[in-house]
């Protein structure tokens, strides 16, 4: 293989590595955002439910978890 061909292969490998790394970072960012949103929603619902006697009476195991 000539020097030019080896350099071209190196550039293609570097580009492919960068693209794979970039897309996997974006996917993990989406997962983290989804987990944070779920935690926020569940804590809000838990506070709302557990502050009402009827709801907390129907879900005792759910309301005891956070307290």
From Swiss-Prot:
Keyword terms, alphabetized: Acetylcholine receptor inhibiting toxin, Amidation, Cleavage on pair of basic residues, Disulfide bond, Neurotoxin, Postsynaptic neurotoxin, Secreted, Signal, Toxin
GO MF term set: acetylcholine receptor inhibitor activity; toxin activity
Residue positions where Glutamine amide is found in the record: 65
Localisation per UniProt entry: Secreted
Expressed in which tissues: Expressed by the venom duct.
Disulfide bond positions: 49-55, 50-63
InterPro entries: Conotoxin_a-typ
GO cellular component: extracellular region; host cell postsynaptic membrane
Signal sequence residues: 1-21
Propeptide residue interval(s): 22-47
Main location: secreted
Additional facts recorded: Both the globular (with C1-C3; C2-C4 disulfide pattern) and ribbon (C1-C4; C2-C3) isomers shows no or very weak inhibitory activity on muscle-type alpha-1-beta-1-delta-epsilon/CHRNA1-CHRNB1-CHRND-CHRNE nAChRs, alpha-4-beta-2/CHRNA4-CHRNB2, alpha-3-beta-4/CHRNA3-CHRNB4 (IC(50)=1928 nM by globular isomer), and alpha-7/CHRNA7 (IC(50)=1935 nM by globular isomer).
Role of this protein: Alpha-conotoxins act on postsynaptic membranes, they bind to the nicotinic acetylcholine receptors (nAChR) and thus inhibit them. Globular isomer (C1-C3; C2-C4) selectively inhibits neuronal (non-muscle) nAChR subtypes particularly human alpha-3-beta-2/CHRNA3-CHRNB2 (IC(50)=35.7 nM) and alpha-9-alpha-10/CHRNA9-CHRNA10 nAChRs (IC(50)=569 nM), while the ribbon isomer (C1-C4; C2-C3) shows weak inhibition on alpha-3-beta-2/CHRNA3-CHRNB2, but not on all other receptors tested.
Family of the protein in this entry: Belongs to the conotoxin A superfamily.
UniProt comment concerning the protein's domains: The cysteine framework is I (CC-C-C). Alpha4/7 pattern.
Name the record gives this protein: Alpha-conotoxin G1.5
């Amino acid at each position: 293989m000539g020097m030019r061909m080896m350099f071209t292969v190196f550039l293609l490998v570097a580009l492919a590595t960068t693209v794979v790394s970039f897309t996997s970072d974006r996917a993990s960012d989406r997962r983290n955002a989804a987990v944070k949103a779920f935690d926020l929603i569940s804590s809000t619902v838990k506070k709302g439910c557990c502050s009402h006697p009827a709801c907390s009476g129907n879900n005792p195991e759910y309301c005891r978890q956070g307290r």
